[in-house]
């Protein structure tokens, strides 16, 4: 109750698998800036501040700490998923692929209108929310900018949590 007194709001929502982390917030707060995080990481103390500072610099972009870069075949088609991404997103590019484990800040309306279409994402991409989110932001044309973080692995500390209980 103490956190609720400070402004924390807890809402129950439908379980839509891994999409539950972001989609209900997008539906209920369509004009909000939203930060996505995982519950099995200890984050640096300035984690939110750095994301928000980047957002304030240019509110049209998605900012993230950790991600990949999408690779393509010579004919321009994307490589299969397991070959398609390499860790090492850099700079600002539409082909940067943020990974949610280390935090992402989404500006309002940075995604295609189908982003929250439950029937569509559960049919086309039921187990890969990160792929769905990336495609929806690419369709909108939103750039993704990597926030360089020296000593990343020592700042973002994973907790050893059983996946079935989280």
Map each language-model feature to its residues:
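Active-site nucleotide-sugar/metal-binding loop of Leloir-type enzymes
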Residues: 22-33
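Short, high-confidence coil segments that cap the C-terminus of an alpha-helix
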Residues: 31, 58-61, 142
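A short, glycine-/small-residue-rich helix N-cap motif at loop->alpha-helix starts
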Residues: 13-21
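Short beta-strand-to-loop acidic/aromatic patch adjacent to the donor-nucleotide binding site
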Residues: 31-42
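Conserved catalytic core of nucleotide-sugar-dependent glycosyltransferases
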Residues: 25, 42-120
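Acidic donor-binding segment of Leloir-type glycosyltransferases
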Residues: 1-12
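C-terminal catalytic/acceptor-binding lobe
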Residues: 113, 118-166
